[in-house]
Swiss-Prot record:
GO terms under cellular component: cytosol
Function, as annotated: Catalyzes the reversible interconversion of serine and glycine with tetrahydrofolate (THF) serving as the one-carbon carrier. This reaction serves as the major source of one-carbon groups required for the biosynthesis of purines, thymidylate, methionine, and other important biomolecules. Also exhibits THF-independent aldolase activity toward beta-hydroxyamino acids, producing glycine and aldehydes, via a retro-aldol mechanism.
Disulfide bonding pattern of the chain: none
Residues recorded as bearing N6-(pyridoxal phosphate)lysine in the entry: 230
Enzyme Commission numbers on file: 2.1.2.1
Protein name: Serine hydroxymethyltransferase 1
Gene field: glyA1
């Protein structure tokens, strides 16, 4: 028998302390990891709901368990809103994560051991786009394209040359650390030239796309995936959508998710996705995404004024990649120094990085989370100046302590969740 006043604090104080400390960390530290964001209390409410108790293998109206009449409604709302948000004719909201959504696409469209062509992890791609440490590089023959050394843009000529040479079954667009705008139409043309499927992982820019501020890949790709957190600011999860109007592909995708890769869906997370999609359809969400872009540009301006190199010479989305090779600072050391001052970033490889992925020569910075808590251009410029102060004198304890105090004061002015 349960009562509503049961709680973690009295039952498991050790765990509750860790959870409480994480709440404090999120409130008192500045979050600049480009893939992290804060979801709304409405999304949190759905994630903590009793829908977590319901098993619902299958799809709405076609379940293997009874008692699914209400979770069917929740999942159908999520499906319909996802399609509306991105102009798609198909949506599968069941993937537990972006990587599992990507795995389902591979399973649906590529023969075991088949050839794929994706963006190099070292140039800003993702593990699941053909990296040798991922299923995408272990179970498939993966080839990699990258950035042009002079322009910092995707090297489409190299991409086309590799596509013609290797004849991949699938070409993958999308990235985890690229600050430019992708020419989806050109990539589809290359895919058509070699008879390949064109698959886009838009996880990092899905929120910008939903707001109409970044080119939508749905009209060009056979299949598109995304996470539902990051710029979408929803729960941690995955999504597959398409506008190709090919029912055979849709059927393959559904089968690849269930039963091919997953069993029962997480109905509480699917409900949270439905909430997040409704939030993303609002006018306020577009304003938020506009501010994300404005803050990213402000960050670039300060970094370049202070003599720091930004990969691709700027940004056209929510993130930027800081190249520290000329400063002779490792990404690992920069990450640690900023973390000590309560500024959370992540070390990241840069193009032609001489250091290992465990050390790196760069930092990836993103503005979705700081914008979500209300930082504007003024606050972003001040913050970026503090970052430069630390990197200018990375072992200076006085600078670190001063910035930590400034961070604490700024965070107090802009709480993540106001009381």
């Amino acid at each position: 028998m349960f009562t509503r006043d049961m709680n973690i604090a009295t039952f498991d104080p050790e765990l509750f302390e860790a959870m409480s400390n994480e709440v404090v960390r999120q409130e008192e530290h500045i979050e600049l990891i480009a893939s992290e964001n804060y979801c709304s209390p409405r999304v949190l409410e759905a994630q903590g709901s009793q829908l977590t108790n319901k098993y619902a293998e299958g799809y709405p109206g076609k379940r293997y368990y009874g008692g699914c009449e209400y979770v069917d409604i929740a999942e159908q709302l999520a499906i319909d809103r996802a399609k509306e948000l991105f102009g798609a004719t198909y949506a599968n909201v069941q993937p537990h994560a972006g990587s599992q959504a990507n795995a389902a696409v591979f399973q649906a469209l590529v023969t075991p051991g088949g050839k794929v062509l994706g963006m190099s992890l070292a140039h800003g791609g993702h593990l699941t786009h053909g990296s040798h440490v991922s299923f995408s590089g272990k179970s498939y023959e993966a080839f990699q394209y990258g950035l042009h050394p002079e322009t910092g843009d995707i090297d489409y000529e190299e991409l086309e040359r590799l596509a013609v040479e290797h004849k991949p079954e699938m070409i993958i667009g999308g990235f985890s650390a690229f600050s430019g705008v992708v020419d989806w139409a050109r990539m589809r043309t290359i895919a058509d030239k070699v008879g390949a499927y064109f698959f886009v992982d838009m996880a990092h820019v899905a929120g910008l796309i939903a707001a109409g501020l970044y080119p939508n890949p749905v009209p060009h790709a056979h299949v598109v995936t995304t996470t539902t957190h990051k710029t979408l600011a929803g729960p941690r999860g995955g999504l597959i959508i398409s506008g190709c109007d090919d029912e055979a592909i849709y059927k393959k995708l559904n089968s690849a998710v269930f039963p091919g890769g997953q069993g029962g869906p997480l109905m509480h997370i699917i409900a949270a996705k439905a909430v997040a999609f409704k939030e993303a359809l609002s006018p306020e969400f577009k304003v938020y995404q506009q501010n994300v872009l404005a803050n990213a540009l402000a960050m670039v301006d300060v970094l370049q004024d202070r003599g720091y190199k930004v990969v691709s010479n700027g940004t056209q989305n929510h993130l930027l990649l800081l190249d520290l090779i000329d400063k002779d600072i490792t990404g690992k050391d920069a990450d640690a120094a900023l973390g000590k001052a309560h500024i959370t970033v992540n070390k990241n490889s840069v193009p032609n990085d001489p250091r290992s992925p465990f050390v790196t020569s760069g930092l990836r910075l993103g503005t979705p989370a700081i914008t979500r808590r209300g930082f504007g251009i003024e606050e972003t410029k001040a913050l970026t100046g503090w970052i430069c102060d630390i990197l200018d004198d990375i072992e200076n304890e006085d600078v670190s302590k001063r910035v930590q105090d400034q961070v604490k004061e700024l965070c107090a002015r802009f709480p993540v969740y106001q009381k």
